[in-house]
Amino acid sequence: MPWPKEHKRNTRERIVGAAAAAFRQQGFDQVSVADIMQRAGLTHGGFYAHFTSKDDLLIEALAHASTQVTSMLESPPADPASADRLLPAAMTYLSSFHLAHPEQGCPVAALGPELIRTGQKFRNELTAEIRSRLNQLYDLTSPELPPKIRRQQIAGALACMVGGLILARGLKESERRKFLEECHSFLRAALVDSNPKGATPKRRGTPPSKHTNSHRPRKSL
């Protein structure tokens, strides 16, 4: 008697979840199909009833990991009245927990350098994840700011977030917390202390496509 569809779907999800955690924790090349199935509590032979290869599995594992990061960054801000939620999200990303648990965190920080070395093999998946994160962070910026300033903020913030996490994981354990605190200070200065000096708020209700020069920040002489 064949297994019900729900059982097969649940088994597939177990494999994807186990792979997403293992790849981020140990690296794609360091994890075998047998390792993944053991982590999922399943037999090795059952893998090919769901996936054609480990490469095929990685694509779904990256999507699973991306969903986890999206949920992590959508945590409510400390100040619900604040229109700018980018800084709280960046602080959550650069947290001690995220630092210590790559298996539950950002796939770009955990796997990005490794996947880049594969050339075009997984480039589409990596690009999609970076774009997804940029879009999410853009929505967390203050709508009072001009679109150009918002784009600059998310580019700088994501670079600091991903780069900061990679560098912190490469440091001695005794140095990691201090380094994260310095990243926090930098982001706070860049995202909070520079406003409203660094940008002139746009009028409420003005769509980005109709944004005029009169509302843009003036260039310094």
Q: What is each model feature region?
A:
Residues 51, 110-117, 159:
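Short helix-capping/turn signature of helix-turn-helix
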Residues 14, 22-56:
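Helix-turn-helix
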Residues 51, 58-65, 72:
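Alpha-helical DNA-contacting segments of helix-turn-helix folds
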Residues 17, 83-98, 113, 155, ...:
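Amphipathic alpha-helical segments that line or abut small-molecule/effector binding pockets
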